[in-house]
Structures are given as C-alpha cells and as structure tokens.
Amino acid sequence: MLSLSERAPICSPQSAPSASASDTCKMEENMNQQKTLEADISNTSVNQSPQSKILPESSPDNQDAEHEYRSPPPISESKELSPQSRTTPGSSPDNQDTEREYPSPPPISGSKEISPQSRTILESSPDNQDNGHEYPSPPPIPESIELSPHSKALPESSPDNQDIEPECPSPPQIPESKELSRQSKILPESSPGNQDIEPECPSPPQIPESKELSQQSKILPESSPDNHDIKCEYSSPTPIPESKELSLQSKILPESSSDNQDIKCEDPSPTPISKSKEVSPQSKILSESYLDNQDVERECPSSILITESKELAVDLPGSISLAPEKTASTDVGENSSLAFIFPKSTLAGDDALKSVFDMAKAHLECEDSKVKEELYVESTVVIRDDMVVNPASGVESIDMSENLLESLMEQSCGTFYMDGTTALEGFLSGSTKEEPQCSSPIALSTCSSPIALSPWGEHGYYQGDSVGSSLWGVQDDDPIGNIWPLSSQAPALQYSSGSTAHFIDEATVTHGNNGVVLSSTPGEEVGLPNSGVCTDWGLVEQVNPETNDASVSMIDKNSGLVDSQPSANDGSDVGTARNTNHNTNLSLNHETAVPLSRSSGEASRKHGFITDLNVATSEEALGNTKNWNPYAGNANRGSQRNHHRDRYSQISESWLLSSNYSRSRSDGFGTGGSSRSTPRGQTQRGICKFHENGYCRKGASCNYLHP
C-alpha cells in the first residue's frame, strides 16, 4: 500500500514556479487518467453494474490511494450495462500502474432491472475520495421484475460523510411484486450533517400479490434536517395481500413539525387489510395537528383491520354541519338506505313545518272559497248571446261580464265539470271595453251565505238601492226606459241539486228535473212542477205590492216553491197566448244542455235546448212600472239608470236576432207562442238558421220562420 509520503506527482507545488503552474499540471494529470480509463472500458464486458454510473471526481492529491484496494470484479451476461463505471474519475499517471492490480467485481447475471439505489450518486469532495471504494460492490439481484423505489431520489449528502455512504448492501430481491410500497415515493430532504447513516436501513421486504398498496404515506410530511439520522431505522410496512381497495384513512396526512420528526416513524406500519372490498373512508380528511404535538402522532397503528366488509361507512359529502370541527357521517347497513343528514337552517324545525302547513292550509281555503262561489250548472247555461228580445219592445239583453265565468263554474257534490261545448267568450259583450270592472248581477249562494255581486262595483247596490233597468238593459226611449226593474230587497239564490238558475231579462230560468220555473217576470204566472227538500235554484225576490200590471213572483226560501200572484189586469194562464202588457213565451226542452258558444248554432241544434223570450211591452205597462221603486229612501236611482242607459244602447237589434235564441218554440206553454205577432203586444218567431236553399235541416219539427 502506498502512503502519502511516497507520492511523486509530476508537477508539485514545490517544483512549480507559481500556483498557476501547479493547477495546470493537475489538469494534465486528469486528462491522462481519463484517456487511460477509456481504453480500459473498451476491454470490459458489455453490461456493468449501475452502482458506479456517475463516480465523483477525485482530486489528484488523493488519487494514489484511490485504487489501492480491489477493483470491482467483472460483470458478465448482464443485459443492461452497469452505469457505475461509465464515467470514472480520472486518475493520475503516478497511480496508473496499480489501477488494475485487483480483479473486477463479480458478474451480475440474469438481472432484468438493476437496483437504482445508486443510480444517482452525488459528487463527493476530493478530500474524502480515498476511501470511496474500500468495500466490494453489491451482490447480484437476479430475476427482479420491479425494484424498490425506496431510494429513487436519494438526498444530497455532504462531502464530509460520503466516505461511508456505500457501506450498506443493495436491497434484497423483491420477486413477483406488481406494485411496490409507495411509502417512500417522496423522501424528505435531509441535512448533509446526518446523511452518513441514512442508507443503513434495509429496503422494504417483499410484498407479494398486492394489487393496491397502502396509500397511508403517499405524501410524507417534510422533516427537519436535524432529525433525519434515524428516520429509516425501522422496517417498511408489512405486506398487504389481496387488498382490492386500500385504506383511505390517511390520504392527506397532517403536516408535522420539523422538531418532532425524529420519532415519527418509530411505530409499526399499518396492519394488513385483507379481503376488504370496501374500506371505510370515515377519516379521508384528517384534521391538521399542531406542530408541537406531531411527535406522538403516529404512536398508534394507523389503520384498523377491516375483514370481509361489504358495506360502506359513508361519509356524506352533502351533509353540512354548522360545527366545522365535526364530520357528519352515517353508517349504512346492508339492507338500509342512506340516511342523509340535512343541513341545519336558521329556521327551527317546528317553524318550518308550521310555515309549510300554513301555506297548504291557505291553498285549501282558497280552493274552498272558490268552490263556494261557484254555481252548479248541470245541463243548462244561458248566455247573453243566446237571448231573443223583440226589436219592437226595445228591451235589450243582459250584458254579462267576465266575472260571471267564475260564478258559473259547475259544482256537483264537490265535483266540478264544465260542458265541452262551453265557449267562454259568450259572456263577453260588445261593450265590455266601455264598462269599468263589471261583475255579475247575480247573487250567488252555495248552501250557506249569499254573495251579492254588484254589476258596476257599487257598494250600496243591494243595501237599499233599487235595482234599476240598467241592470238588465234599457233603451233610449223614455216610455220604455224603465222596463221591468228587478226589485229585490236581499236577492239570494237558494241551493238545489241538479238544477240551474239564470237571469234572462229580469227572469230566473230554472231548469229542474221535471219542469221549468220562470220567476220574477212581471205579468206572468209560473208554477213549479217538482219541489223537494233540496229544490232548484231560485231568486228570492220581494216585489213591491203597489204594482198593478205586474204579478208578484215569490220563491219560498225553505221549500223553493214559486208563489206567483198575477195582477188584476193580467188574468191569463200559462199555456195561453196572452195579448196583455207582458207576453213572455218560454219554451224549454230540458233534456240536454245549452251550449255557451256565441256562434255555436250546430251545438244548439245538437242539444236541442232552446229558450225564447219574446217580450212585447206596451206604453201602458211601462207607464205603470216607470216610477216603480220599492226601495224606500232612495230617489237617486233613476239618474243612475239614465247614466247606464246609453251604455247598452249600442247593441244592435240585428245582432240579437242572429243569436241562437231568436227562435220561438211553444212546446208546453200554449199555442200562441208560435203565432206571428205585431211589434206591439204580440209574439214573434225567429228566423231559422238551419234553413238553406229552401230546406231546413231540422225537418218538419222546426217551428221557426223559413224565409
């Protein structure tokens, strides 16, 4: 062995004139050593050990003792070259004679992949390079499919402790491992002061048949460089065989302090989780621990053995807890559904339920109120368009508004229905644009309380004011300006089942089961054929007995019977053609319903319900009823009638004649209804709309005029 005193460098500092000359000599020595090594490498085997891929450069001062020991034995039959000696440091020409005195390292045969423990060997200082190769090369690693990545990225070591870095042997063989332990994928950087004993720990043992490895330490916390000397003193985690899903308990590990990192790995690795199909993710997100308490973080085992668990312990992500320190988790049984934890609201549970119940109750009450306001119409609905008024009488039809639509909804013991042929536009008149918020002039009642609706939004309409002719339509002529005022102190409709009440020119047409009731028509007697416990709808009217030419038609509130008292001037009966002051011919075929369509002549023909109201009024009768005002204490109603008189005068008589009810039929009310009458005091038949080209589609049963 050569000593330092026996070295004879070519250019020494004593023989050189200056320091620059000594540096030049050292550079020349390094170049000569590199050239010599290149010639030696060409004679070696094809594959060499990767332990010396990048050897640190050594200074020329310590180069004489660098190769005093055995060189590595030759490596033969290796598929991949050993990168350990690809780039060997240059040696001085003084020590070149003893460079090959020792045999090469033993061959590493049958190795598919070489251990990457020393793929990247950090450069060491030239002062400590003399003891860099005092030990033999690592033993061969045969038939290893994938090597342990425990030392893929080795931390940089200081040049002071590099002399004993390769003392540890290479990791043992890990055969048939599909996926290696990821515990040390990312190794924390260590300080150069404690790097001398870092690789002393053996590599992790074999992990056979593990499909997915423990991810407990995917992200290892950074450790301080002061306590890194004993980090790897303990063994790697035990094998986890046949685990399909790994424990997610510590996916995100809390950051640890640098002061207490020395005992972080003192405890054993997690216990094996075998045959676990679904693993509890209860602690996916672990709370971050403080830096001072990190020394006792891993004193306990990290995971719990879960064997043959099929059900998940579900941590509901949608559950929001007001307390952020608590995690809302629900264990789900095998046959049970997920129990969700709903977020807490500022409103208490009782208040929330109360508000929901209040909303539902209000909705039901609204619907109930609509039910009470709806008039039951079984089969007959009479509209303004289907009314016939004698043009000579000057009486115009009722102008019903949109609000009547809601009042004519059908009610049959809690069941609602509308006729399919109902056309809602029939309730709209030609002068609705001129009227300010007209409502129905009908007083509705559903078995209990009557609802009085004013036609023009007047408050005291049914509280003492006389119901003038403006309610039912008037004409500009003064002699017939106040025609048939409907006098009713408190008009109310009595409830009955299976019937219909309508207003046609001061007349309530009641379509009963066996007959027709016409009430509140002056100068006419109407009888009720059928009366029961719950009878037809009828308008309760109180007529002033001072009238002479008009009959008083009363309906009993209890029985619904019509009490008609003809006047002394009117002695005619129903069923006779009367040539009196008021002649009303009502012909009803009460088997089917009346269509609501304005232009549905076909529907009228199908249903066969025709109501003809031909009124012939003389000046004598008008004179008797002109100043008829049964309401006491109200003398201003006449001016209101005059105000509303012009509003309804715009309806043309030709439009009235073109309606479906311009035809007069006298099926059960006498023979005089079908006779041709004069404009004053006589009846008049309508013109048949079904007569085309000299042929009527109704046949011989048609009683209308065929021009």
Swiss-Prot record:
Species in which this protein is naturally found: Oryza sativa subsp. japonica
Name of protein: Zinc finger CCCH domain-containing protein 20
UniProt keyword Zinc-finger, yes or no: yes
InterPro entries: Znf_CCCH, Znf_CCCH_sf
ZnF C3H1-type: positions: 682-707
Superkingdom of origin organism: Eukaryota
Gene Ontology MF annotations: DNA binding; zinc ion binding
Region (Disordered): 1-290, 558-605, 624-647
UniProt keywords, alphabetically: DNA-binding, Metal-binding, Zinc, Zinc-finger
Low complexity bias (residue ranges): 8-22, 579-590
Pfam families: zf-CCCH (PF00642)
Keyword Zinc-finger: yes
Segments of skewed composition (Polar residues): 30-52, 81-95, 112-129, 246-260, 279-290, 561-570
